[in-house]
Structures are given as structure tokens and as C-alpha cells.
From Swiss-Prot:
InterPro entries: CbiN (IPR003705). One of its GO terms (cellular component) is ATP-binding cassette (ABC) transporter complex. This is Cobalt transport protein CbiN. Forms an energy-coupling factor (ECF) transporter complex composed of an ATP-binding protein (A component, CbiO), a transmembrane protein (T component, CbiQ) and 2 possible substrate-capture proteins (S components, CbiM and CbiN) of unknown stoichimetry. Subcomplexes composed of CbiMQO can be isolated from membranes but the CbiN subunit is not isolated in association with them, suggesting it is only loosely associated. Expression of just CbiMN in E.coli confers some cobalt uptake.
Length: 103
């Protein structure tokens, strides 16, 4: 990957992180937003299922979310790396092009 492309990707990533902070964006979970929307739409709604286990605190919940994200990033990186390695192996093992003598 060229260094110019790497710089553009890095700048885009930084922009995705910084722009919401500068705009005063609020970081909230989708679960809370969904619960608010359901409560506004259907007052008195009672969920029909309960979680099997609730983490003891928000920090533990954040830890599990971060671990899940790290595991997902690892799997995606592993798949991309394996595919890239397989492509390089195929390229190295490809037969050399044959040249025919000119007549």
C-alpha cells in the first residue's frame, strides 16, 4: 500500500473520530434509543424476554463490548491476511509465461 493512500486512510479515520466530538454528538447505545422509541410509541410496553445475565456494572458491559470488537477485528484481519497470503502463494507458484521464438 502506498504511503499516500495510508495517509488518506489515517486522515479519514481521524476525521470520523473528531468530527462527531466537535459537533457535540452524543454517544449512546442503540438499546437505550430503541427503548425510548418503543416507550414513546406504545406507552406501558412490557418486554416479553429478559436477559439471561446482566453485567454487574456499565464498565463490565463496556469491557465485554470492547472484547467483542477486538475479537471481530482479529477475525477480519486474519481472513484478510490469509487471503492475501494465498494470493501471493498462487502468484509465486504460477508457471512462467512461455515465450515462442520469432519466425
Amino acid at each position: 500500500m502506498s504511503s499516500k493512500r495510508t495517509l488518506w486512510l489515517l486522515a479519514g479515520t481521524v476525521a470520523l473520530v473528531v468530527v462527531p466530538l466537535l459537533m457535540g454528538g452524543e454517544f449512546g447505545g442503540a438499546d437505550g434509543q430503541a427503548a425510548e422509541l418503543i416507550e414513546a410509541t406504545v406507552p406501558g410496553f412490557a418486554p416479553w424476554a429478559d436477559p439471561l445475565w446482566e453485567p454487574p456494572s456499565g464498565e463490565v458491559e463496556s469491557l465485554f463490548f470492547a472484547l467483542q470488537a477486538a475479537l471481530g477485528a482479529f477475525v477480519v484481519g486474519l481472513v484478510i491476511g490469509r487471503r492475501q497470503g494465498a494470493a501471493k502463494t498462487r502468484e509465486q507458484n504460477a508457471p512462467a509465461p512461455r515465450s515462442f521464438p520469432a519466425e
